Each structure stands twice: as structure tokens, then as C-alpha cells.
From Swiss-Prot:
Taxonomic superkingdom: Eukaryota
Organism: Rattus norvegicus (Rat)
Highest classification ranks of the organism: Eukaryota, Metazoa, Chordata, Craniata, Vertebrata
Name of the protein this chain belongs to: AP-2 complex subunit alpha-2
Sequence segments annotated as region (Disordered): 615-681
Molecular functions (GO terms): clathrin adaptor activity; disordered domain specific binding; kinase binding; phosphatidylinositol binding; protein domain specific binding; protein kinase binding; protein serine/threonine kinase binding; protein-containing complex binding
Compositionally biased intervals (Low complexity): 646-667
Keywords: Cell membrane, Coated pit, Endocytosis, Lipid-binding, Membrane, Protein transport, Transport
Subunit structure: Adaptor protein complex 2 (AP-2) is a heterotetramer composed of two large adaptins (alpha-type subunit AP2A1 or AP2A2 and beta-type subunit AP2B1), a medium adaptin (mu-type subunit AP2M1) and a small adaptin (sigma-type subunit AP2S1). Interacts with clathrin. Binds EPN1, EPS15, AMPH, SNAP91 and BIN1. Interacts with HIP1. Interacts with DGKD. Interacts with DENND1A, DENND1B and DENND1C. Interacts with FCHO1 and DAB2. Interacts with ATAT1; this interaction is required for efficient alpha-tubulin acetylation by ATAT1. Interacts with KIAA1107.
Regions of compositional bias (Pro residues) in chain numbering: 668-677
Function of the molecule: Component of the adaptor protein complex 2 (AP-2). Adaptor protein complexes function in protein transport via transport vesicles in different membrane traffic pathways. Adaptor protein complexes are vesicle coat components and appear to be involved in cargo selection and vesicle formation. AP-2 is involved in clathrin-dependent endocytosis in which cargo proteins are incorporated into vesicles surrounded by clathrin (clathrin-coated vesicles, CCVs) which are destined for fusion with the early endosome.
Pfam families: Adaptin_N, Alpha_adaptin_C, Alpha_adaptinC2
Family: Belongs to the adaptor complexes large subunit family.
GO CC terms, sorted: AP-2 adaptor complex; cytoplasmic vesicle; membrane coat; plasma membrane; synapse; synaptic vesicle
Membrane protein topology class: Peripheral membrane protein
Length: 938
């Protein structure tokens, strides 16, 4: 080993490390370590005082021994003494030893804290940096108690050097993450926000990380950071600016800072219009740069550019308010779906899953369905295939449900075992949600059991039985299908359960066919009996006693089975008891009693799909971010508006015209009695005392209301405390709205009371009912409220939702307009050109037509215009108008009292950037209101 002088290094340490490495056995290593420990102990206890170099060397040896896994029970005081040295290397080793070996319960903690305080007060940037690093590395609650009040002062002090500011910001971030309750908010918060304008890259990057974390828990304190972050981001991404151009990384200016600024902006709702315009320009610039040819072939360039791009797309999705940006983001991600880099394909699929939840970009996402299906078949990485499954699930609607379900079933046969159960749940949900033909639903679930029976949970096969029982029109087909499926030589046990239950209820519907006579049905089921587990055998015994009631001709055969020793003397108590009771019942009961006891199962009253609940449980606990998941659960096809679902022919089925496939409950009939008291189910209470305390509409409420005219799902309102999300569906004159109240803070909301305020005339035209919500909303959680809606007659105004609650001892009062508008009760109507103009001429009275000529408020994009007309509820009639640039629509407004036909014509003038909208309906008030609503969309 080359000689190392005393001034350049520690020769003794180097020799010791070399000796340890040269040890041939564990015993030799321990012997050498014990020898060194004895030497160090003697040096520390010797009469001769050690100089700083020797202390440093011996402390380093102790540190090395500790890192080898051996206990160290001395040397701590010597390390603490090094903290008071004025030599950098000695102080550095002292802090290193303290950070690694000293715990918060040490008797030396007071001495250590004093040394750290001295260094923080020294104004020596090197010593201050070492002290801050030590505090951050230890990061204990005791450290937070001692220094959480001092570090913010260092951070915002005008004479603090940039390197120390950077360390102080990161140190404070570490303490806040471990002990947020010990970091006081004060005057420094407003000053730390201005660090976003600092010219030192390290300072502004560290400050952005700190502000982002603080803003998530204290949004009101840091809301001024939004405009500063947008301004700084604009200066970075705009090529004309010279801000931080010295920090360009492979032709990408300050990529890490750009990502952090974009992430900070996701902590807040869309900013006010002035700032929003500048932010939109930034996002457009980032999307434009993504389309430019790469300036370097090196991977660092593409990584930096794509990091900024994906964070920008996340912000676009979070705001969900700019249709053009959403569609552009979708198109950009679509290009990445076939990129040679696996990580980019994964990230593109993941981001598109969220984009599919937006009304504006759902159609754009659907255009990539073939690429996603191909990824499902060809990707070698299982995580990418799983994201492809998630995206197919998110983009599914009635127009592509059968194709997507078929592809998922095909993939399920070869899918990785770790994700099979989740795929099974998703297939079951999609098949149920979009089943217009219930024979297809039955076939799909049985195929699901055949392919992945081990992963089909009880919730799935319970659900298919519930739906078959609730629908007369599919019972015969289900019985025939399960009978045929059971004839396979090898059947999964779940198929035996489904088959046994359905044949026990509806086997009589196929008994007329000689190929499925009662005896054949019984023999088929009994051939599987001895291969099944105890719970399945118990179910089959119940099927047998049902057969006794349905088919008297097989009664004797079944009694012989029940009477056999294998049943009456079965080791399992449940099977034995069933055999004894069923045998006795079949022997002593008269035909009438038997028919009464064993009558057909009544329809299942259900409020929530257990399959959907199970999928959510697999995805994690409910939080505010579940609003994004809620958006994905699309129950209405955005491509074609609400579609009719065949009503059940069962006499006991629910009266709702919407076949509630997800079991979310039918719309109840209008109440005939007086409304319940304030603790009851009605949310509408216009005479309540709280009406006098209703707050004015929240800022931006009108804009958010207008956005929901052509969409049914999304975030209606968001501030620093509360997020309100909506998901709604409408069928003819009935509707149902799910409201999600999300607590964005870590503190409980108390006395949480939502109230719906309706004007007198609106209350007579619109019937609204709901159940009360829990008055306590935990931090980071959400509660759901369901409003059942019935349109009695046409209306103009919208109800106002007022939310009152207590947060941190202060009273909060928020009011927003609830987007229940007349067009929600639109039923699209297809008609030929001749029929359209014939009907147009019939509605020629002046009071039946309303026309509006107005300036375009948004870019005049054909596809977005089509999507908005369809989202408005009207059918979009192609090739009807002689001018192909015009848009023509037709539909019927359904109310309880009448149906109102509606025709519309939208004529764009691209040169003048103007529109002319003409509406003709059989009722003048309807024409006027629909014209007002639709005009605001363009």
C-alpha cells in the first residue's frame, strides 16, 4: 500500500481495513477486531491527551467496526468532542459517527444538540451544512423538537448562503415528514414561497419540494405559490426566456425543477383565468416540444424530456378542464404505446387509464383500442400487460364492451397468476355493467368460470345467480346453458355450484326436452357430488330437495340418496343434518307444504354490487383520490348518451326503467306522504332554518356548472379543504346522482351537513330524494351521497347544494350549483333526412323556434363539437344537413307529465369565429332553456 502522509489521510485506518480484508476466516476477523478495540480503548483511557487527528482516526475505526456488524459501547464522548473542533475533517467525522451510532435516548443528546446549535449559529456555511445534514440524517422527533423552530429562520434569512438554504429546505422537509405536528407554521411560510423565484437551482428545487409537501397539508398557507410556480415554469419552458438556461441538461432546461413545479400545481384546483391562460401556454409548449425531433440520440435527453412531458400530462388530467389539451395529451401518449422503450409504454398506458375517465378525452382514448389489445397479446413484461388490462377496463363502454370482454377472456387463459383474480373481477363487472343481451352475460360468466375457476370468487358466482333470479327473460337460457356446461368431463367446482343452484330453481324450464329430463338433470349433478368439497355438497343437497318439489318422478331416487349411510352418517355435521332434515321433509310434508317451503327464490333487493366492492377493496382503502377511480366506473356511454336497458319481465322486479346492473338500487317512487323531518331521507328542505345561513355561490361555480351540461362525471368543486365529485346517470325522466365529498385535509370535518336548496317553482317541477350522510368525515376520506331525481315538468333553474361543516374549530359554508339541467332528460332519437325536415317544418310556429347567434368562446374543433352535442343528450344526425359543416341533432325531453320533441341545428362560421344555433321544440320554454344551455358550450 502506498504511503499516506498524516496530512492526506489516516494511514492507521487504511492498514486496519486492509488487515480485515485479508482475514481468511470469521474467527481471524473477530480476533483482529478485538485487538483493535483493546488498542483504541487503551488510547482513550490513557493519560496522554489525544490530538484531533488521533481521535478522528480511532472514531473512524469504531465506525468501520460498527458497519461490519459488531456492537460498539464506547467512543461516543470522543465523537462528541470532535463536534467542537474547528477543523472540517474532524467535525465531519464526529457528525458521521453521531448520525450512525447515537440514538435519541443517549445521555449525550444534550451535548450533541448544543454542538449543533453552536454550528447553526456560527454563520460558517460549511459548519452549518454539516449540522443540517446531521439533523436530517437522524430526523428523530427529538431533533424536530430541538430545531424545528430554528431551521425556518435560517431558510428565509437574507444573509444565508445558497448552499445552506438548500440544506435547510431539505432538512425542514425531512423533519416535517417525520413530525409534522412539531413544525410550526408562521410568518416564514409567506417568505419561503418567494424562494420559487430564487436564481440558484439547488435552492429553488429544494424549496419546491418543501412547499409541495407543506401545501398538501396546509393548502391555504401556500396558495400564493400557484402564480409564482406558473410564472417560473413559463420562464423555464419558453425558449425566449433565459431563466436557468445555464442548467440545461441534455438540451432540456432544468428538467427536475420543471417536474417539481408541475407536481406542486397538482396540489391545487385550476387557477384563476389570468394565471390559467399562462399555464395553458406552458402546457401547450411542453406538448409541442414533445413533437419536435430529438436534439440528441442519448437516452438522457429522452428521459429528461419525457419526465417533463408525463408530469405535464398528469397536471392536464388533474385539472380536467381543457378539452384541447386532454385530446392532445391522449394523442401524444398514443404515440408512446408502440415505443421501443418498455418504461415509456408502461407510463403511457398508466396515464391513458386516467385520461379515459374524462368526458373530453374518452373518445380519443378509444381510438387506440387495437394497439392496447395488441400490447395485451405481445408484451413480455407482465406489469405492462396489467396496465393494458387496466386501460381496456377504463375505456370500456357499450360500443366496445363485447370486444374488450372477449379479449380479456382470451388473455386470462395465459395471464400471470398474480393478476388473474383482478382480471376476473373486471370481466365480471364489465359483463354486468354493459349487458344489454343477458344471454351474453350468462355465457361470459360461465366462460369465465371455465377459464379461471380457481380465481372466481364467491362474489362473482353469487352475482350471476342474483341476476338470473331477478330476470325472467334469461332464466330458461341460463338453465339450458349450465346444463350443457356440466356435461363436460371436467367441471370446475364453481360451475357445479352455479349449475346446482340454477337447476334447482329453474330446471323445470328445460325439463320438457328429453335430453334434459328431470332424471338426467339429477344424475348429471350427482355425478359431480363426490368430487366436490363439503360446502358444494351441501348446496347440491339443497338442489336435490328442490328437485323433489319440482319433479315428483325423481322423488324416490333422491330419497334413496338422502337415506344412504354416506349421507345420514356423514362425518360432517352440516351434511348429516341436511340429509336428515331433507329426507324427513320429503317424507312427511304434503305437496302443498312442500311447494310452500321450497318455493322459488324471490328477487334479490340489492343496493351495492359486491363484485365492485371487492375490486375496490383490492385497490386499497377509500380516499379522496377514489374520485378518479369513480370517474372510471362509467355507467353511461359518452359516445351515445344513455342507452335503454331491457326491463325485467319479472313481476317482483324493481319498477325502475333502468336495469340496475351494478345493484346500486332503483329510483324509488315519489313519496305520497309528508316529507320526513330533518333527520330523515329528504335532502330538499327549503323551509329549514339553515337556508338563512346559505353562503353565496363559490367562485367558479357557474363555470363548473357549465362544464357539466355535456358531461355526467367529474369534479364539481374543489378548494383547499373539500373536493366534491359527481357521477350521474339518467334514463328518460328519472335520474340518479352520486355525490362524493372528499376531505383533502388530515383533520376531521364535524357536523357535516349538505342541504339542497330549491326555488318554489323548481320544487314542483323536480322531485329529489336522498339519504343523509355521516356528519363526520375523517381526514383523507370521502363519503358518498345518492340523489334520486324525477323530472315532473320542464324547468329552468338548477338546485343549489349547500355544504356546512366545522373544520379545526372554524365554521365552513360552501354553496355550488348542482348540474341537474333539462337536457339531462334527453333521449336521443335517430331519424332519416326526410323525416327530420318534415318534422322541422311542422315546428315552424314562431314560439316554437329559438335562435342564437354568438361568438365562439372555445377553439372551433369538429370532433369536440360532435362530442358536446352527443354529451348534451341529442342524437347526432349525419348527412342530414345539405351543408356538411353543419351539425344536426334530434331527441325527446322526457318528463313525468309529457314528452317534448326537440330538433337542433348548429351552423359554424370558421372565418368569423361565430355560431348560429337554432332549436325547435313543441314547447317554447323548453326551446329557450335548451338554447341557453347549449350556447354556453361553444
Amino acid at each position: 500500500m502506498p504511503a499516506v502522509s498524516k496530512g492526506e489521510g489516516m494511514r492507521g485506518l487504511a492498514v486496519f481495513i486492509s488487515d480485515i480484508r485479508n482475514c481468511k476466516s470469521k474467527e481471524a476477523e473477530i480476533k483482529r477486531i478485538n485487538k483493535e478495540l483493546a488498542n483504541i480503548r487503551s488510547k482513550f483511557k490513557g493519560d496522554k491527551a489525544l490530538d484531533g487527528y488521533s481521535k478522528k482516526k480511532y472514531v473512524c475505526k469504531l465506525l468501520f467496526i460498527f458497519l461490519l456488524g459488531h456492537d460498539i459501547d464506547f467512543g461516543h464522548m470522543e465523537a462528541v468532542n470532535l463536534l467542537s473542533s474547528n477543523r472540517y475533517t474532524e467535525k465531519q467525522i464526529g457528525y458521521l459517527f453521531i448520525s450512525v451510532l447515537v440514538n435519541s435516548n443517549s445521555e449525550l443528546i444534550r451535548l450533541i444538540n448544543n454542538a449543533i446549535k453552536n454550528d447553526l449559529a456560527s454563520r460558517n456555511p460549511t459548519f452549518m451544512g454539516l449540522a443540517l445534514h446531521c439533523i436530517a440524517n437522524v430526523g428523530s422527533r427529538e431533533m424536530a423538537e430541538a430545531f424545528a423552530g430554528e431551521i425556518p429562520k435560517i431558510l428565509v434569512a437574507g444573509d444565508t448562503m445558497d448552499s445552506v438554504k438548500q440544506s435547510a429546505a431539505l432538512c425542514l422537509l425531512r423533519l416535517y415528514r417525520t413530525s409534522p405536528d412539531l413544525v410550526p407554521m408562521g410568518d416564514w411560510t409567506s417568505r419561503v414561497v418567494h424562494l420559487l423565484n430564487d436564481q440558484h437551482l439547488g435552492v429553488v428545487t429544494a424549496a419546491t419540494s418543501l412547499i409541495t409537501t407543506l401545501a398538501q397539508k396546509n393548502p391555504e398557507e401556500f396558495k400564493t405559490s400557484v402564480s409564482l410556480a406558473v410564472s417560473r415554469l413559463s420562464r423555464i419552458v419558453t425558449s425566449a426566456s433565459t431563466d436557468l438556461q445555464d442548467y440545461t441538461y441534455y438540451f432540456v432546461p432544468a428538467p427536475w425543477l420543471s417536474v417539481k413545479l408541475l407536481r406542486l400545481l397538482q396540489c391545487y384546483p385550476p387557477p384563476d383565468p389570468a394565471v390559467r391562460g399562462r399555464l395553458t401556454e406552458c402546457l401547450e409548449t411542453i406538448l409541442n416540444k414533445a413533437q419536435e425531433p430529438p436534439k440528441s440520440k442519448k437516452v438522457q435527453h429522452s428521459n429528461a424530456k419525457n419526465a417533463v412531458l408525463f408530469e405535464a400530462i398528469s397536471l392536464i388530467i388533474h385539472h380536467d378542464s381543457e378539452p384541447n389539451l386532454l385530446v392532445r395529451a391522449c394523442n401524444q401518449l398514443g404515440q408512446f404505446l408502440q415505443h421501443r422503450e418498455t418504461n415509456l409504454r408502461y407510463l403511457a398506458l398508466e396515464s391513458m387509464c386516467t385520461l379515459a375517465s374524462s368526458e373530453f378525452s374518452h373518445e380519443a382514448v378509444k381510438t387506440h383500442i387495437e394497439t392496447v389489445i395488441n400490447a395485451l397479446k405481445t408484451e413480455r413484461d407482465v406489469s405492462v400487460r396489467q396496465r393494458a388490462v387496466d386501460l381496456l377496463y377504463a375505456m370500456c363502454d357499450r360500443s366496445n364492451a363485447q370486444q374488450i370482454v372477449a379479449e380479456m377472456l382470451s388473455y386470462l387463459e395465459t395471464a400471470d397468476y398474480s393478476i388473474r383474480e383482478e382480471i376476473v373481477l373486471k370481466v365480471a363487472i364489465l359483463a354486468e355493467k354493459y349487458a344489454v343481451d343477458y344471454t351474453w352475460y350468462v355465457d361470459t360468466i360461465l366462460n369465465l368460470i371455465r377459464i379461471a375457476g380457481d380465481y372466481v370468487s364467491e362474489e362473482v358466482w353469487y352475482r350471476v345467480i342474483q341476476i338470473v333470479i331477478n330476470r325472467d327473460d334469461v332464466q330458461g337460457y341460463a338453465a339450458k346453458t349450465v346444463f350443457e356446461a356440466l356435461q363436460a368431463p371436467a367441471c370446475h367446482e364453481n360451475l357445479v355450484k352455479v349449475g346446482g343452484y340454477i337447476l334447482g330453481e329453474f330446471g323445470n324450464l328445460i325439463a320438457g326436452d328429453p335430453r334434459s329430463s328431470p332424471l338426467i338433470q339429477f344424475n348429471l349433478l350427482h355425478s359431480k357430488f363426490h368430487l366436490c368439497s363439503v360446502p358444494t355438497r351441501a348446496l347440491l343437497l339443497s338442489t336435490y330437495i328442490k328437485f323433489v318439489n319440482l319433479f315428483p318422478e325423481v322423488k324416490a331416487t333422491i330419497q334413496d340418496v338422502l337415506r344412504s349411510d354416506s349421507q345420514l352418517k356423514n362425518a360432517d355435521v352440516e351434511l348429516q343434518q341436511r340429509a336428515v332434515e331433507y329426507l324427513r321433509l320429503s317424507t312427511v310434508a304434503s305437496t302443498d307444504i312442500l311447494a310452500t317451503v321450497l318455493e322459488e327464490m324471490p328477487p334479490f333487493p340489492e343496493r351495492e354490487s359486491s363484485i365492485l366492492a371487492k375490486l375496490k377493496k383490492k385497490k386499497g382503502p377509500s380516499t379522496v383520490t377514489d374520485l378518479e377511480e369513480t370517474k372510471r366506473e362509467r355507467s353511461i356511454d359518452v359516445n351515445g348518451g344513455p342507452e335503454p336497458v331491457p326491463a325485467s319481465t319479472s313481476a317482483a322486479s324493481t319498477p325502475s326503467p333502468s336495469a340496475d346492473l351494478l345493484g346500486l338500487g332503483a329510483v324509488p317512487p315519489a313519496p305520497t306522504g309528508p316529507p320526513p323531518s330533518s333527520g330523515g331521507g329528504l335532502l330538499v328542505d327549503v323551509f329549514s332554518d339553515s337556508a338563512s345561513a346559505v353562503a353565496p355561490l363559490a367562485p367558479g361555480s357557474e363555470d363548473n356548472f357549465a362544464r357539466f351540461v355535456c358531461k355526467n362525471n367529474g369534479v364539481l368543486f374543489e378548494n383547499q379543504l373539500l373536493q366534491i365529485g359527481l357521477k350521474s346517470e339518467f334514463r328518460q325522466n328519472l335520474g340518479r346522482m352520486f355525490i362524493f365529498y372528499g376531505n383533502k385535509t388530515s383533520t376531521q370535518f364535524l357536523n357535516f351537513t349538505p342541504t339542497l336548496i330549491c326555488a318554489d317553482d323548481l320544487q314542483t317541477n323536480l322531485n329529489l330524494q336522498t339519504k343523509p350522510v355521516d356528519p363526520t368525515v375523517d381526514g383523507g376520506a370521502q363519503v358518498q351521497q345518492v340523489i334520486n331525481i324525477e323530472c315532473i315538468s320542464d324547468f329552468t333553474e338548477a338546485p343549489v347544494l349547500n355544504i356546512q361543516f366545522r373544520y379545526g374549530g372554524t365554521f365552513q359554508n360552501v354553496s355550488v350549483k348542482l348540474p341537474i339541467t333539462l337536457n339531462k332528460f334527453f333521449q336521443p332519437t335517430e331519424m332519416a333526412s326526410q323525416d327530420f325536415f318534415q318534422r322541422w317544418k311542422q315546428l315552424s310556429n314562431p314560439q316554437q323556434e329559438v335562435q342564437n347567434i354568438f361568438k365562439a368562446k372555445h377553439p372551433m374543433d369538429t370532433e369536440i363539437t360532435k362530442a358536446k352535442i352527443i354529451g348534451f343528450g341529442s342524437a347526432l344526425l349525419e348527412e342530414v344537413d345539405p351543408n356538411p359543416a353543419n351539425f344536426v341533432g334530434a331527441g325527446i325531453i322526457h318528463t313525468k307529465t309529457t314528452q317534448i320533441g326537440c330538433l337542433l341545428r348548429l351552423e359554424p362560421n370558421l372565418q368569423a369565429q361565430m355560431y348560429r344555433l337554432t332549436l325547435r321544440t313543441s314547447k317554447d320554454t323548453v326551446s329557450q332553456r335548451l338554447c341557453e344551455l347549449l350556447s354556453e358550450q361553444f
